[in-house]
C-alpha cells in the first residue's frame, strides 16, 4: 500500500490513534477468547485504504492488491471497469459459475466507485444472471434492489457500463429486448414515480431509447406492493410488482447521468453506446436547469421555488424566492461552514423565534437543495422595526434576547454565508456578490498599496473617513454606508431626496439628520428608508438618522441639503446614483436566497422501535412492553411451569458432543453450528440449499425454552440484583440463524440506561456540521489537555498557551454535544462493567466524569453505509450537533446539508458487534460496521470534500466576476481548494477560513419546532413568524400548508378509517374485520379500532380557522368544506330522535 503523504506531526497523530486502536483490539480479543460471544475475536476488519475496504466489504480475496496496482496508472472509474473484467475472467477470486463471477465483478466495481463505504454493492445488487435472447444468444441481467439508491446516480449508471464491459470480456452477447418488455419498462417507471419518488423522470421516448439500446438487461427484485396493469406475466420478467431498483438505475442513473457515462465511454473507447448522444440531446438534467436569463443584455439569476414545495406545518418559511428582505448572500467560509453547511447570524436565529438552531436544516433556493445551519457572528444579523418605530440591525445575541419581544417586523433577515466550493460542487453559476468589506478592503489596498492597513478600524469607519477615502482614493463607498438602492425605484429615490431636501434638518457637525415623522410616514418614505436598511430612531415627532452624510451625498444633496440635480437619465437607479453622487456606489445585496425550515437538528440516543436492552427473543411472553421480567414469570396456562416460553429460535448442534441447543457455545466449550434442515422436505441438510427441492434451508423453528432459568442464571453470573426499572427484549430475532445475544449484556445495558441497536451496539445520533478549527475554551477542554492530545500550536504557528487561540482541527477528531457525552460516559461505564463482571478481565476506561472521556476512540457510521470511520473525542458543545472535520463526514459518504449520523464507542463496537445479529433481509447489512477505516486519506473520501476552499480570503477578481454570473469552474485554478492540495502534506494542515465566529454553539440550544407542543401550536408559531417577516407572504404559506400537509393528511386518514383493521389490546393480533363475538378469538382480549375518530378530525377545525383568517383561495376553502361534510356523514349518529310538540312551536 502506498504511504499517505503527511507531515511528521500528522503521522505521529495517526500512529497514536492506531496504537490506541491496537491496544483496544488486543483487550477485546482477550475478552472474546473466553467464548462468550458468537466469535472468539473482533468481527470488524480494519481497512487502511479503499482497496482494503472493497475486499473486506465484498469478500473477494486478492482484490485489494489488484486495485492498488490499477490505481497507479488509471483513474478511479477506469480502474473500476478494468477490475470488473479481471474478476469476471477469473484472474482474481474463485467462482463456481460464469454468472457468479459476473455478479462478483459488478459488486467489486460498484464498491470501488463508492469508495468501499456504502452498502449498495452488497444490498443494492441482488444478483446477476445469464438469460437467453430470442436468437439463442446469451445476455446478462443485473437485478437491482432499493438500497442501490445509496450509491448515487453516477455509480448506478456506471454499474451498467461495468456489466457491459464485463460481459464483453467473457464473450456474452448484448440484451435484445422484446417489444412487450420495452412497454413494460415504460409503464413500470411511470407507476414507480406515482408510488415513490424520482429525482428525474425520463419521458416515454427516453425510456424506450435506453431499453432498446442498453446492452445489459436492467432487472430488479419487487420492492413495491403495486402491480403493473398491462404487460403482465412476461416470460423473462419474474414479477408483476414494481421493481424499485430497476426504476432508480434507469431513471436516476442512465437517464440523468448520461453525460458522465458518455465521458467514460469515450475515454475507454467502448462501442455500442453511441445512443447516449441522442439521449443527452433530449435530456436536461434537473441540476442543469436554466439558471440565468438575459435581461437588457445582462445575465440575471432567476428565482426558483422548488424548495417551497411540500411545505409542512410548523416548519416556517423564512423567505420567498429571491425576495427583498430574504437572506442576503455573502461569499466566504467560516470554520463551521462549507460542505453544504451555511452560516447565519446567531442573533437572527433568536429573532426568528428560535426556529433555527445550530444544526437545523434549511431547504434553500440555491446553490444546493438544502443546508445545515451554523452560527457565524462576524456576518450581519437581521434588521428589524421595533414597536416604537425604531429601525435597527441586531448583530449580537445579547441584543437579540433583549429586543426580540419588541420586534414588530423583521425587515431583513440578515446575511447567509455560503462558500465558493458549494457553488462549484453544485455547478451553479456564481450569483452576484454583495458589496462587502472583504471586497472593499482589496480595492482599498489596490488604490493605496503603500498605506499600512488597520482592518479593525477600517471595518467600522466614521462617515467622514468613508467619504474622504472615496474622494482621495477614488474607491467605492464603504459597505457600512452602502444602502440597498436596488430595492427601490427612481420615483422613490426622487421622493426621498425631495423630502430630505425640503424637510430635513441636519446637525451642524453632520452627526444627525432629523425628518418630520408624520410627513415621512404619510409620504411612504419611512418604508423606503426601511427598504434601504437605513437605521433610524423615533424621538418624539422626529425621525433621526445617525451618520447621515453618506446617505445625503448618495441622494445627490450637499451638506446644505440642496438638491443638485433635476431629473434622472438612466433606468437603473444605481447608474443614476453613481452619476449624481460623485463617487461609486456598488450593489449592497444583489442576491437574495429563499429558505424554509427542513428537519430540526438532532442529538439523541439511537433507539429501535420499541427499544430493547437485549437481543433476546421472548415472543408474546413479555406482553406489549417486551418485558423480560414478565417473560421469566410467564405461564401459558395455570398448570404450566412459570418461565417456560415458546419462541422461534435457531437450533444449533455441537460438532464435538452432538448436544443440541440454541446457544452459540456448548457447555463442553466447543462452538456450535446451525442445524440446517429443509422446511419443505423436512430433511436435515448441511448445505444452504436442499439437494432435493432446491429450497433454502433454515435452522429456525418454534421451541420451548426455560427462560426463567436463563434469566436467573444471567443475573447470578454477573452478580447483579433483579431490581431493574425496565428490562426489555425483542419478540423475534431477525438474523439468519436467530442466535440470541447473551442476556448478561442486556442486564448491564439496562442498569446504565442504554439501549441496543440491531447489531448489538449502542449508538448516539447527531446532525452533521463541519468544523475545521477550534478554540479550546469553546469545547470545554484545557490547554494542557489539548497539548497532551497533540495540539501544540495555533494556526499562526504560535505555541498554545491561551484557550482562546484558534487551532486547526485534526481530521479524525470529533466534538460532540454534552448530552452525547453523558451517554458515551455511561457506555464507558457499561463496557467496564461488562469487562469485569461478564468477561472477568480488568476495566479499561475507569471514567467518572465527562472530562475523563476526552481522548477516547469512537466510531462514526452513516445509515446508508457499511463502513465505520475511526474517530477521537476531543471536546464538547452545547449545540445539538456532532462537529467533525469535513473529511470525516466525507469518509462516511455524507455532507452537511442536514444529514445525521451516529457515533458509537469504539470498544463497544469491537466487543459487542456481531454479524450473527444482523437482520437477514434486504438492507440488513446497511448501517452496520462491516469494516473500519482507520486512517483518512483525503484522496479516497467523497469527492465533494475536494471542492472545499481553504483560503483566508477570496481574490478581487472573484467578486468582480460574480457580477457577470461567471461559471464557478473558471476559478478552480485560482482558489485554494482541497483538490489542489491532494498528495501533499498540506492536504491535512494549514487550512484557513475567511470569516471567524466567536462561538460554534451560539444561538438557541434547540429549535422551537422541538420545544413547542402540539402541531397546532407549531402551526400558529409558523404563521405568526410569517406575518412578522417582510420577505414572507403569510397567506401563501397558509395555503401551501393546507394543500400540501393538512388536506392530504385528512383525506388519507379518512381513507385509512374506512379500510382499517382491528387489534386485540392483549395479544396485539390484527383482524381485517371485527370478530362477531366482539372479543379476540385467540386470547379473549378486547378488540379495538386502529384508527380513531380523533385522528381523522384533528386538523379540521384548525384548517377552517386558517382558511378564514388568511383568506386562502375559494377552491381550498371548498375542499375543506367538502371533507368536513364527509367526516360529518361518517361520524354523525344517523338514528332518528324522538321529537316533542315543542320542536314544532
UniProtKB/Swiss-Prot annotation:
- Keyword Electron transport set for record: no
Q: What is its EC number?
A: 2.7.7.7, 3.1.11.1
- From what superkingdom does this record's organism come? Archaea
Catalytic reaction equation(s): DNA(n) + a 2'-deoxyribonucleoside 5'-triphosphate = DNA(n+1) + diphosphate; Exonucleolytic cleavage in the 3'- to 5'-direction to yield nucleoside 5'-phosphates
Which is one GO molecular function term here? DNA-directed DNA polymerase activity
Task: Alphabetically list the UniProt keywords.
Answer: DNA replication, DNA-binding, DNA-directed DNA polymerase, Exonuclease, Hydrolase, Multifunctional enzyme, Nuclease, Nucleotidyltransferase, Transferase
Region (Disordered) residue ranges read 284-303
Disulfide partners: none
Q: Which GO terms describe its biological process?
A: DNA catabolic process; DNA-templated DNA replication
Subunit structure as annotated in this protein's UniProt entry: Heterodimer of a large subunit and a small subunit.
Role this protein plays: Possesses two activities: a DNA synthesis (polymerase) and an exonucleolytic activity that degrades single-stranded DNA in the 3'- to 5'-direction. Has a template-primer preference which is characteristic of a replicative DNA polymerase.
Which family does the UniProt entry place this protein in? Belongs to the archaeal DNA polymerase II family.
Question: NCBIfam families in the record, alphabetically?
Answer: polC (TIGR00354), PRK04023.1 (NF003103)
Q: What is this protein's record name? A: DNA polymerase II large subunit
Amino acid at each position: 500500500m502506498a504511504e499517505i503523504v503527511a507531515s511528521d506531526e500528522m503521522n505521529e497523530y495517526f500512529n497514536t490513534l492506531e496504537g490506541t486502536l491496537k491496544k483496544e483490539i488486543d483487550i477485546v480479543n482477550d475478552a472474546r477468547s473466553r467464548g462468550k460471544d458468537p466469535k472468539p475475536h473482533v468481527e470488524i476488519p480494519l481497512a487502511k485504504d479503499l482497496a482494503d475496504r472493497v475486499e473486506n466489504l465484498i469478500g473477494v480475496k486478492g482484490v485489494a492488491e489488484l486495485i492498488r496496482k490499477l490505481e497507479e496508472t488509471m483513474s478511479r472509474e477506469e480502474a473500476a471497469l478494468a477490475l470488473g473484467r479481471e474478476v469476471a475472467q477469473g484472474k482474481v477470486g474463485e467462482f463456481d459459475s460464469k454468472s457468479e463471477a459476473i455478479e462478483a465483478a459488478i459488486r467489486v466495481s460498484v464498491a470501488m466507485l463508492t469508495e468501499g463505504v456504502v452498502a449498495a454493492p452488497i444490498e443494492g445488487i441482488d444478483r446477476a444472471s445469464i438469460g437467453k435472447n430470442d436468437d439463442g444468444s446469451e445476455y446478462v441481467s443485473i437485478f437491482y434492489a432499493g438500497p442501490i439508491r445509496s450509491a448515487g446516480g453516477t455509480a448506478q449508471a456506471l454499474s451498467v457500463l461495468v456489466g457491459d464491459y464485463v460481459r464483453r470480456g467473457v464473450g456474452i452477447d448484448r440484451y435484445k429486448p422484446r417489444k412487450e418488455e420495452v412497454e413494460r419498462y415504460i409503464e413500470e417507471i411511470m407507476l414507480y414515480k406515482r408510488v415513490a419518488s424520482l429525482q428525474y423522470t425520463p419521458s416515454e421516448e427516453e425510456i424506450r431509447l435506453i431499453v432498446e439500446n442498453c446492452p445489459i438487461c436492467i432487472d430488479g427484485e419487487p420492492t413495491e406492493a403495486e402491480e403493473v396493469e398491462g404487460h403482465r406475466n412476461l416470460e423473462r420478467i419474474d414479477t408483476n410488482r414494481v421493481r424499485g431498483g430497476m426504476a432508480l438505475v434507469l431513471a436516476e442513473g442512465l437517464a440523468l447521468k448520461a453525460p458522465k457515462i458518455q465521458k467514460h465511454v469515450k475515454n475507454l473507447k467502448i462501442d455500442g453506446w453511441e445512443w447516449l448522444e441522442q439521449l443527452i440531446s433530449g435530456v436536461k438534467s434537473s441540476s442543469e436547469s436554466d439558471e440565468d436569463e438575459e435581461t437588457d443584455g445582462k445575465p440575471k439569476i432567476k428565482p426558483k421555488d422548488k424548495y417551497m414545495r411540500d411545505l409542512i406545518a410548523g416548519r416556517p418559511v423564512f423567505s420567498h424566492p429571491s425576495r427583498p428582505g430574504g437572506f442576503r448572500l455573502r461569499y466566504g467560509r467560516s470554520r463551521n461552514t462549507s460542505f453544504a453547511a451555511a452560516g447565519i447570524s446567531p442573533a437572527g436565529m433568536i429573532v426568528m423565534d428560535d426556529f433555527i438552531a445550530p444544526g437545523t436544516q434549511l431547504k434553500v433556493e440555491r446553490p444546493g437543495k438544502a443546508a445545515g445551519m451554523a452560527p457565524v457572528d462576524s456576518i450581519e444579523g437581521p434588521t428589524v422595526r421595533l414597536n416604537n418605530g425604531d429601525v435597527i440591525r441586531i448583530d449580537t445575541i445579547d441584543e437579540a434576547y433583549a429586543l426580540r419581544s419588541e420586534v414588530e417586523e423583521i425587515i431583513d433577515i440578515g446575511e447567509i454565508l455560503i462558500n465558493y466550493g458549494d457553488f462549484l460542487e453544485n455547478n451553479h453559476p456564481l450569483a452576484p456578490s454583495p458589496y462587502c468589506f472583504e471586497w472593499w478592503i482589496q480595492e482599498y489596498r489596490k488604490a493605496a498599496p503603500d498605506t499600512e492597513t488597520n482592518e479593525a478600524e477600517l471595518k467600522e469607519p466614521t462617515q467622514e473617513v468613508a467619504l474622504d477615502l472615496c474622494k482621495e482614493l477614488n474607491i467605492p463607498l464603504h459597505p457600512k454606508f452602502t444602502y440597498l438602492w436596488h430595492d427601490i425605484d427612481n420615483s422613490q429615490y426622487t421622493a426621498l431626496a425631495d423630502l430630505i431636501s425640503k424637510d430635513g434638518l441636519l446637525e451642524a457637525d453632520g452627526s444627525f439628520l432629523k425628518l418630520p415623522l408624520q410627513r415621512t410616514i404619510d409620504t411612504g418614505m419611512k418604508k423606503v428608508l426601511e427598504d434601504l436598511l437605513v437605521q433610524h430612531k423615533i424621538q418624539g415627532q422626529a425621525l433621526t438618522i445617525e451618520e447621515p452624510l453618506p446617505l445625503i451625498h448618495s441622494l445627490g444633496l450637499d451638506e446644505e441639503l440642496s438638491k443638485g440635480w433635476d431629473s434622472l437619465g438612466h433606468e437603473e437607479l444605481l447608474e443614476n446614483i453613481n452619476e449624481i453622487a460623485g463617487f461609486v456606489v456598488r450593489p449592497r445585496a444583489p442576491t437574495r436566497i429563499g429558505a424554509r425550515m427542513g428537519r430540526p437538528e438532532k442529538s439523541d440516543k439511537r433507539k429501535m422501535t420499541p427499544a430493547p436492552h437485549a437481543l433476546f427473543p421472548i415472543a408474546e411472553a413479555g406482553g406489549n412492553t417486551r418485558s423480560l421480567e414478565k417473560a421469566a414469570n410467564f405461564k401459558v396456562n395455570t398448570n404450566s411451569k412459570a418461565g417456560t416460553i415458546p419462541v422461534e429460535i435457531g437450533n444449533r448442534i455441537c460438532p464435538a458432543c452432538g448436544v443440541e441447543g440454541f446457544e452459540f457455545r456448548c457447555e463442553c466449550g466447543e462452538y456450535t453450528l446451525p442445524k440446517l434442515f429443509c422446511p419443505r422436505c423436512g430433511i436435515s441438510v448441511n448445505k444452504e440449499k436442499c439437494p432435493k427441492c432446491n429450497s433454502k434451508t433454515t435452522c429456525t423453528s418454534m421451541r420451548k425454552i426455560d427462560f426463567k432459568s436463563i434469566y436467573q442464571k444471567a443475573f447470578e453470573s454477573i452478580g447483579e440484583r433483579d431490581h431493574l426499572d425496565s428490562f426489555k427484549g425483542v419478540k423475534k430475532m431477525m438474523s439468519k440463524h436467530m442466535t440470541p445475544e447473551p442476556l448478561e449484556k442486556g442486564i448491564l445495558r439496562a442498569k446504565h440506561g442504554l439501549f441496543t441497536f440491531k447489531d448489538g451496539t449502542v449508538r448516539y445520533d447527531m446532525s452533521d456540521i463541519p468544523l475545521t478549527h477550534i478554540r479550546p475554551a469553546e469545547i470545554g477542554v484545557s490547554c494542557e489537555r489539548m497539548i497532551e492530545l497533540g495540539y501544540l500550536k495555533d494556526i499562526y504557528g504560535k505555541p498554545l498557551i491561551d484557550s482562546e487561540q484558534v487551532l486547526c482541527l485534526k481530521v479524525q477528531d470529533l466534538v460532540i454535544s454534552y448530552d452525547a457525552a453523558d451517554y458515551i460516559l455511561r457506555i464507558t461505564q457499561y463496557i467496564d462493567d461488562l469487562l469485569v463482571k461478564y468477561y472477568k478481565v480488568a476495566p479499561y476506561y475507569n471514567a467518572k466524569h465527562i472530562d475523563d472521556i476526552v481522548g477516547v476512540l469512537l466510531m462514526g457510521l452513516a445509515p446508508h453505509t457499511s463502513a465505520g470511520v475511526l474517530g477521537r473525542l476531543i471536546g464538547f458543545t452545547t449545540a445539538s450537533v456532532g462537529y467533525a472535520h469535513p473529511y470525516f463526514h466525507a469518509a462516511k459518504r455524507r455532507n452537511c446539508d442536514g444529514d445525521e449520523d451516529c457515533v458509537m464507542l469504539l470498544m463497544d463496537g469491537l466487543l459487542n458487534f456481531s454479524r450473527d445479529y444482523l437482520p437477514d433481509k434486504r438492507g440488513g447489512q446497511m448501517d452496520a460496521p462491516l469494516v473500519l477505516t482507520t486512517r483518512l486519506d483525503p484522496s479516497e473520501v467523497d469527492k465533494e470534500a475536494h471542492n472545499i476552499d481553504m483560503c483566508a480570503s477570496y481574490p478581487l477578481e472573484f467578486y468582480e466576476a460574480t457580477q457577470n454570473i461567471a461559471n464557478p469552474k473558471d476559478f478552480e485554478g485560482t482558489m485554494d481548494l482541497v483538490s489542489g492540495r491532494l498528495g501533499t502534506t498540506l492536504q491535512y494542515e494549514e487550512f484557513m477560513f475567511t470569516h471567524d465566529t466567536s462561538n460554534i454553539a451560539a444561538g438557541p440550544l434547540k429549535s422551537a419546532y422541538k420545544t413547542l407542543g402540539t402541531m397546532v401550536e407549531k402551526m400558529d408559531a409558523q404563521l405568526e413568524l410569517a406575518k412578522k417577516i417582510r420577505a414572507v407572504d403569510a397567506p401563501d404559506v397558509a395555503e401551501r400548508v393546507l394543500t400540501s400537509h393538512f388536506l392530504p393528511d385528512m383525506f388519507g386518514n379518512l381513507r385509512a378509517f374506512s379500510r382499517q383493521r382491528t387489534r386485540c389490546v392483549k395479544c396485539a393480533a390484527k383482524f381485517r374485520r371485527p370478530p362477531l363475538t366482539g372479543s379476540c378469538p385467540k386470547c379473549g382480549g378486547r378488540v379495538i379500532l386502529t384508527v380513531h375518530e380523533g385522528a381523522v378530525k384533528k386538523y379540521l377545525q384548525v384548517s377552517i380557522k386558517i382558511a378564514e383568517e388568511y383568506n386562502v383561495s375559494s377552491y381550498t376553502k371548498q375542499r375543506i368544506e367538502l371533507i368536513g361534510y364527509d367526516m360529518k356523514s361518517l361520524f354523525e349518529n344517523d338514528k332518528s330522535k324522538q321529537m316533542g310538540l315543542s320542536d314544532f312551536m
